[in-house]
Amino acid sequence: MTNTQKAILAGGCFWGMQELIRKQPGVVSTRVGYTGGDVPNATYRNHGTHAEAVEIIYDPAVTDYRQILEFFFQIHDPTTKDRQGNDRGPSYRSAIFYTDDEQKRIALDTIADVEASGLWPGKVVTEVSPAGDFWEAEPEHQDYLQRYPNGYTCHYIRPGWKLPRRATSGS
């Protein structure tokens, strides 16, 4: 398989995000890191305004960007600014880092569907920004919940959660 694509998502602590996303059909690999901020060569101890994020490599013959985003919106709360569960601060914000104009279009369309669906109680605060440098997190953060299955996470699959497409005029 040579045709893969990349998605970069932030939705709180990267341990739980990575653990759930890695299990999705079509996901080839994941790695956690820091992106969307101001510090070069970011680390856990010095990541400035970067978000904890997951870089996802996927096979577009098996899954697509929209499906990945729908799952992303199912496993984290996109209506809380700079917070997921007990974690607070800009590192834990909800963000989509797009790699091209098509990803940006799909991200904005998916957010509009989330807003229209009423599946979340508040307004979606997920940032949509161009992808920049992605600083890979230290080895102890990679695959964390694989090594510590009872480790901390605030992410979970919501049973029965299915994102409908909103009705749009003219389509």
Curated annotation (Swiss-Prot):
State its Enzyme Commission number(s).
1.8.4.11
Q: Which cysteines are joined by disulfide bonds?
A: none
InterPro entries the UniProt entry points to:
Met_Sox_Rdtase_MsrA_dom, Met_Sox_Rdtase_MsrA_sf
Is Oxidoreductase set as a keyword in this record? Answer: yes
| Molecular function via GO | L-methionine:thioredoxin-disulfide S-oxidoreductase activity; peptide-methionine (S)-S-oxide reductase activity
What reactions does this protein catalyze?
Answer: L-methionyl-[protein] + [thioredoxin]-disulfide + H2O = L-methionyl-(S)-S-oxide-[protein] + [thioredoxin]-dithiol; [thioredoxin]-disulfide + L-methionine + H2O = L-methionine (S)-S-oxide + [thioredoxin]-dithiol
Highest taxon of the lineage: Bacteria
> Might you name a Gene Ontology BP term for this protein?
protein modification process
Q: Where is the active site?
A: 13
Q: Name one Pfam family in it.
A: PMSR
Enzyme group, top EC level? oxidoreductase
Entry keywords, A to Z: Oxidoreductase
List, alphabetically, the HAMAP family matched.
MsrA
Outline what the protein does: Has an important function as a repair enzyme for proteins that have been inactivated by oxidation. Catalyzes the reversible oxidation-reduction of methionine sulfoxide in proteins to methionine.
Q: Which PANTHER family match?
A: PEPTIDE METHIONINE SULFOXIDE REDUCTASE, PEPTIDE METHIONINE SULFOXIDE REDUCTASE MSRA 2
Q: Which family does it belong to?
A: Belongs to the MsrA Met sulfoxide reductase family.
The name this protein carries in UniProt is Peptide methionine sulfoxide reductase MsrA
Q: Which organism is it from?
A: Mycolicibacterium paratuberculosis (strain ATCC BAA-968 / K-10) (Mycobacterium paratuberculosis)
Q: List the gene name.
A: msrA
